[in-house]
């Protein structure tokens, strides 16, 4: 069975559950005025929310693809990611 988690009136699924797997659409910060650490926290909070909605958590993540627009932001991103992923 496939379960799609779509925003009200949306056409893009934020998350899809299929055969015991959860696939999330791109997760980005809403507040671009934040520094990289703040933006990363905001995106990861959203991921936590979507995973919980699907009945799972970050402890079960198998793979993650991350896009960073400027390598100067890697240290800040990595700091927040490492604290989040435990």
Predicted regions and their residues:
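N-terminal presequence-like segments and the immediate start of the first folded domain
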Residues: 1-62, 68-86
């Amino acid at each position: 069975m496939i379960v799609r988690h779509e925003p009200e009136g949306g056409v893009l699924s934020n998350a899809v559950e299929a055969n015991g797997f959860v696939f999330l659409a791109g997760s980005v910060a809403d507040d671009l005025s934040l520094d990289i650490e703040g933006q990363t926290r905001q995106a990861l909070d959203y991921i936590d929310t979507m995973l919980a909605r699907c009945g799972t958590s970050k402890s079960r993540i198998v793979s993650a693809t991350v896009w960073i627009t400027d390598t100067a932001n890697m240290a800040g991103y990595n700091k927040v990611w490492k604290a989040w992923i435990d």
